[in-house]
């Protein structure tokens, strides 16, 4: 049966914007089934969901353990239909009825009441379809059916069409499934070098039936809330003395009211204090949007800052739309913050030159008018199936980011545009999100239909997330300019200028105006890695003139993207790029034994077993073969060389212990290599390149396999994340040993905005822990003062000048103690950091058994660790399966007699506390010992 509006009012979705005369049915409350000819049966389904997950819940398939990702390809090759049970209780007296889908993945045909309504082909768009006529002719309660076509089959058919766009051979990059560039779907669904290829399908975001019961009734589809300084332009530094401007624009479904008014109320979320209530000016109606603006003259809201730079002050903004008769038509609430964020790509000024900064152009971020050092990593999709990514999981992941002293994540394309709740978490925790449009490592079609489709995608998502203070940037895509255009130049030199034109047509002439038309507060870069622009002329057909192939000697432009799998130069500072900002760099490693055991049988836990090799997708298969041993051997060999070149080679008699030791060894190499690069990049803040950012690849894993991640699937920290937490502290001391020339320099680097002063103690020990006579000719303590956002060399020598009896039996311990003011703080803070240097590679050191002892404190989650007989390098505390968390300190150095009390933060425990009895400790010595 159907209901009147009075009875239905109680069913309004409580989290949706409120509007006049609407009835909303959340389709997740309905019962659903999933069917396919490939399955020949019907199973219960959820909504939102994806096919693989419903089949898993129904017991049709198992988890993708072992090589089961290959065995599940039949799912991606089939068409699947989600069908609702008859939907009861819709209104009889409605003016119009709509189906609203916040996300369909991807090629979907929608039927309602037995009538085909529409087809969709973009995972990232919101769709609304008028089904009033279909419902009116429906005999009985309506049934909604959504048929999802096989994405691999559909894009293959598009590619084979003679009218489809073609590209030069050897340009496009295929990981597993081919032809991903023809679809507006998560590109990594077709495989990447760190994850599987499931090509999932399904209603991956919520959907609603919306009924409007009056002609003036509306439904709010999307809201664009833009907060910026008066006169602010996306590509110019905002004037911080100007008042704030609030621009509110609401996209509605239904008839636009004539001569509407708009008002806002701005309330402090912490205190509840109202900052202002006012009517908006210049209210306009265009398309399906109602827009108004106001200037907050004389008001000084508390600013939002990234973590480590200040507080995350947030405000609730209530936006109300009223009709000509002062009746409320719609009301929307958005939580936001007052901040400016600006990507500075302007030319180096004479004043900067006078400070010692090399010529060229800037490439760094400024928040609220302040330069800062961006410390962070790259975020990939946290799961192969977005519908099982929870707010709890993302909150835990972002907590690890904050604890890890990171203030920025690059949201890599091509995954998916992040859900609103993920931006909410970033707002709360102070994590800036460099965001990108979902185009990656490919050339894409440039026909009008494709461009029209992606234009709608971009407008929707730019408007959707614009109110979040954590939003830091929009980039057009991943490595299009730095990788794909050079690939064209190599493969088809005569066509290079044509494809540059195609690139500019899409990423500059189309995307840039779409961003600028919908936000004044966010900068835009056409690609993740560029050399910046020559000039911007918004009236020109190509409004941003890019700087391609810069070769100006002594000048620095743009950001850098760096991967070098030649392990012989892993610690050669001369092999690292010198630039203004490092947005992507890294090397892969194995996950821990505990994580492997979640997905791989015991008999397969060998370093080069078939299962381990085939779960390694670097180098990628480049197609759908299931025997990618040759390409995988490249990546496995790179990890092997990283270990054997620098670290003791594990050789345990028990194959599980040996496998675990090898996994750990690859993590040691990875962590040391990243540490070496980040120390180099951070030191660059005080060098002519004025380097102000390092975002390593990558934050987290999508499954259990070798990858570049610092956090494994399931939440366990690799050595990498612990080391990054240490080296991203505000003030650090770093040794720089040039193994070719023998030079040894020690630098102090600071991210603070004002000078910090203190001392660095330099202590030479042999590996038994005895002081080296005369401290090897090195001063025992060096005072220093380091400027804000700067670095300073505090000591330098050559190894040949040191009084070291044996460089293989020596370690330099560096202990920094300083005082300084954290950004936006009036108090002086004590700052400490410890580091070390050896003048031989770990494999060549004459290490001794450090005699590690571990004890349990009266506090259940605290342990004490002590070295009794030698220097413990790479001291590593580990915990068993059944618990997830992290030690407050790990991967550290202990001298004999030194004792550390270290707490463990428990995030999840299924052992009822028994895990504490199985904490272990090891060091580099254990990697060397045969057993």
Swiss-Prot record:
Protein keywords: Carbohydrate metabolism, Glycoprotein, Glycosidase, Hydrolase, Polysaccharide degradation, Secreted, Signal
Enzyme superclass (EC): hydrolase
GO molecular function: beta-mannosidase activity
Glycosylation sites: 40, 79, 247, 282, 316, 326, 347, 550, 608, 658, 738, 790, 798, 830, 918
Signal peptide: 1-21
Superkingdom of source: Eukaryota
Compartment(s) of residence: Secreted
Gene Ontology terms: biological process: glycoprotein catabolic process; polysaccharide catabolic process
DNA repair is among the record's keywords: no
Matches recorded under InterPro entries: Beta-gal/glucu_dom_sf, Beta-mannosidase-like_N2, Beta-mannosidase_GH2, Beta-mannosidase_Ig, Galactose-bd-like_sf, Glyco_hydro_2_Ig-like, Glycoside_hydrolase_SF, Ig-like_fold
Residues at the catalytic site: 479
This enzyme's EC code(s): 3.2.1.25
Chain segments annotated as transmembrane: none
Pathway noted in the entry: Glycan metabolism; N-glycan degradation
Quaternary structure annotation from Swiss-Prot or TrEMBL: Homodimer.
Role played: Exoglycosidase that cleaves the single beta-linked mannose residue from the non-reducing end of beta-mannosidic oligosaccharides of various complexity and length. Involved in the degradation of polymeric mannan and galactomannan.
Family in the record: Belongs to the glycosyl hydrolase 2 family. Beta-mannosidase A subfamily.
Protein name: Beta-mannosidase A
Species per Swiss-Prot/TrEMBL record: Aspergillus niger (strain ATCC MYA-4892 / CBS 513.88 / FGSC A1513)
